[in-house]
């Protein structure tokens, strides 16, 4: 381990630390920009701040995950070359990197919320991020508690941050959380679906080490199980869109997601473990598409497009 670190220059070390944060890869936290709080005047400013906050916090969480799982990762074919698992980054370096990302994310949240409710939002999210890697231990499978549950909560929770950044001075935190429950549920179900598919890539090595993951529920019927999980976010989307009254979102969001998820399940092959990774990638693209669709909706709302269409129809 020592030799690997000594041979790395500062530039190589920086790249290795970045890879522990997954900044060099796609991340589901990017999709948190696709919340209904985007439909206000200063959306771009607030969305940009939320993006940076989520990026930093997700990076810290990924580094923490690699710290806790470094011994497991070293025995899994797909993850054995990760910087911590391979010994290219030391524990001290990773801890410093993680701490820096975390406190920068707190600073960004302070800026987003103007100093309001920072730790009320940050502490539950921090606790879930810290707990996540430990739920992979086999003891939790006995009570049917899987890491995907916590991951779904952690990825859905920042939707509350987005809404609080806009209405926090006018709404109590309890009302903000209540308002965000539908979008949080959507992201929770969605994350459980695509992460179960993603983790199935490692099922062969995971079974050897008795690693806990949601795909163990399905056994040999993983495709049927994924089909069931994929229906849950699709059932949640109509409730969200119906409150916005946007034909555009019915087409760009609901219809697009339905077609995409049907294709994902149709193309999934349990005998080809890499097909789980394909589902994860497809859903990253789906998240980016949803961000774009919501941004278009913001523009349509600003010019009162749907009101004008409704008035034209009445004529």
UniProtKB/Swiss-Prot annotation:
Entry GO terms, CC: Golgi apparatus; Golgi membrane; plasma membrane
- Which cofactors? Mg(2+)
Q: Which GO terms describe its biological process?
A: mycophenolic acid biosynthetic process; terpenoid biosynthetic process
> Where does it live in the cell?
Golgi apparatus membrane
What are the EC numbers?
2.5.1.-
State its role.
Polyprenyl transferase; part of the gene cluster that mediates the biosynthesis of mycophenolic acid (MPA), the first isolated antibiotic natural product in the world obtained from a culture of Penicillium brevicompactum in 1893. MpaA is a Golgi apparatus-associated enzyme that catalyzes the prenylation of 5,7-dihydroxy-4,6-dimethylphthalide (DHMP) to yield farnesyl-DHMP (FDHMP). The first step of the pathway is the synthesis of 5-methylorsellinic acid (5MOA) by the cytosolic polyketide synthase mpaC.
Protein name from the UniProt record: Polyprenyl transferase mpaA
Q: Origin organism of this chain?
A: Penicillium brevicompactum
């Amino acid at each position: 381990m020592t030799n690997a670190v000594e041979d790395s220059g500062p530039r190589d070390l920086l790249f290795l630390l970045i890879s522990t944060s997954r900044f060099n890869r796609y991340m589901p936290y990017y999709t948190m920009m696709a919340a209904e709080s985007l439909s206000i005047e200063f959306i771009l400013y607030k969305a940009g701040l939320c993006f940076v906050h989520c990026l930093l916090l997700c990076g810290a969480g990924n580094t923490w995950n690699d710290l806790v799982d470094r011994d497991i990762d070293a025995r899994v074919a797909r993850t054995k070359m990760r910087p911590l698992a391979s010994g290219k980054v030391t524990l001290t370096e990773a801890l410093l990197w993680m701490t820096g990302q975390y406190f920068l994310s707190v600073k960004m949240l302070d800026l987003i919320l103007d100093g309001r409710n920072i730790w009320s939002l940050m502490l539950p999210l921090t606790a879930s991020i810290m707990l996540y890697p430990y739920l992979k231990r086999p003891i939790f499978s006995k009570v049917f508690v899987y890491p995907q549950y916590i991951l779904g909560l952690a990825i859905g929770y920042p939707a509350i941050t987005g809404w609080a950044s806009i209405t926090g001075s006018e709404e109590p935190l309890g009302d903000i959380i209540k308002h965000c429950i539908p979008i949080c549920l959507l992201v929770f179900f969605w994350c459980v679906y695509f992460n179960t598919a993603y983790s199935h890539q490692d099922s062969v090595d995971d079974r050897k080490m008795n690693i806990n993951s949601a795909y163990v529920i399905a056994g040999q019927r993983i495709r049927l199980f994924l089909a069931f999980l994929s229906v849950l976010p699709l059932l949640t989307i109509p409730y969200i869109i119906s409150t916005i009254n946007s034909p555009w979102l019915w087409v760009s969001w609901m219809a697009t997601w339905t077609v995409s998820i049907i294709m994902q399940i149709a193309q999934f092959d349990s005998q080809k473990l890499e097909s789980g990774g394909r589902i994860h990638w497809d859903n990253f693209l789906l998240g980016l598409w949803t961000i774009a669709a919501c941004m278009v909706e913001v523009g349509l709302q600003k010019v009162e497009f749907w009101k004008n269409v409704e008035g034209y129809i009445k004529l």
